[in-house]
C-alpha cells in the first residue's frame, strides 16, 4: 500500500467525487480570522466538522452499552461551536461526504491543534467502497469544558492505495454505516 499525494487527492475528488465539497488548497483563515486549517495537505485531506453535535450526558444514569445504546444519552445541539463537558465526549459529522474507491483504505487522525488542548478526535478507517458523512467522536480528556469549532478542520484523512483490489468491499458486505447521513449512533 502506498500513501497518496495531494495531486492524487485533487484528481480523485474532481474526477470521481471522492470528497464533496472539496477544497483543493489549505484554508487557514476565514473573514480575516485564523481558523483550524482544512483542505488538501501534502499527503492527506483535513476534514471539517459540521454544526450538528450530540453531546453525551449522564442525566439518565444509564449504562453505556454499544449493543443497546440509549439515544437519550445525548443532547442534540446545532451551533457553530460545541462545548464538551469535562471528561466527556460529543459526536459530530463531517461537512464532507466521502466515496472511497474499491482499492483504497483511509486512516483518519486527529489534528494536533486539538490534541495539544486535551481534545482527542477518534474516527475509524474508511473502508473500500464505503460512502457517507463521517461520524466524528471528540473526547474531552481535561477537567475543564472544551470547545470545538464547526466549519473548521478537526482531523486529517490519509489515503492508502492497495497493490491489488480487495475481494469483498464494505459495500459488498452491506456495511451498517454505508451511506450514513447526519450524526450516526452505534449500531450492533
Curated annotation (Swiss-Prot):
Gene3D superfamilies: 2.70.40.10. Its EC number is 3.5.4.13. Pathway: Pyrimidine metabolism; dUMP biosynthesis; dUMP from dCTP (dUTP route): step 1/2. Homotrimer. Disulfide bonds: none annotated. Catalyzes the deamination of dCTP to dUTP. The lineage of its organism: Bacteria, Pseudomonadati, Pseudomonadota, Betaproteobacteria, Burkholderiales. GO terms for molecular function: dCTP deaminase activity; nucleotide binding. InterPro entries: dCTP_deaminase, dUTPase-like_sf, dUTPase_trimeric. This is dCTP deaminase.
